[in-house]
Amino acid sequence: MYAMQGLDVVERVELHTPFGAPSDRYVVGALAGQLVAFLPRHGIGHRLTPTEVPSRANIHGFKQLGVRYLISVSAVGSLREDYAPGNIVIPDQIFDRTKGIRPASFFGNGLVAHVAFDRPFDQQLADRLYEAAREAGATAHRGGTYVCMEGPQFSTLAESEENRRRGHD
């Protein structure tokens, strides 16, 4: 997914951030009359493993470009039988199993902050995404808990069963 249908590319931007280099160059262009920026999280050619993705640099780069809303698309598995392959799920919660494995904050080195994260996703944006998916004819599910785990492997059957018992989707 390195070309977005309907995107008129204006420029490709290489940025440097306080957190290192982003995954690749940003593609900036117009989509349905809106200025958008796109970045392949794993780099062109899918060359970065999930652990190697420089998430903080990627996010900071979007901030440098003036991006106000960030939408991340992932190909994932489901813990629910009623979620079929190709369905779109717009979660409202996240269960992060990567803590301690990769940097989890923009703070540190003398910069201390405590950030509320009880509602990690913007609900108005999520509502707009849900409506857009439905209008496009997609089967979309609103709400649910996304389990973020360290890849590149997927969960074992035992891990999946535990996540299902916890009510994750």
Where are these regions (language model features)?
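Active-site rim beta-loop-alpha module in soluble metabolic enzymes
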Residues: 120-165
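Metabolite-binding pocket within alpha/beta catalytic cores that recognizes anionic/polar moieties
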Residues: 1-117
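Short active-site oxyanion
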Residues: 66-69, 165-169
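Residues that cap or flank secondary-structure elements
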Residues: 17, 50, 121, 151-152, ...
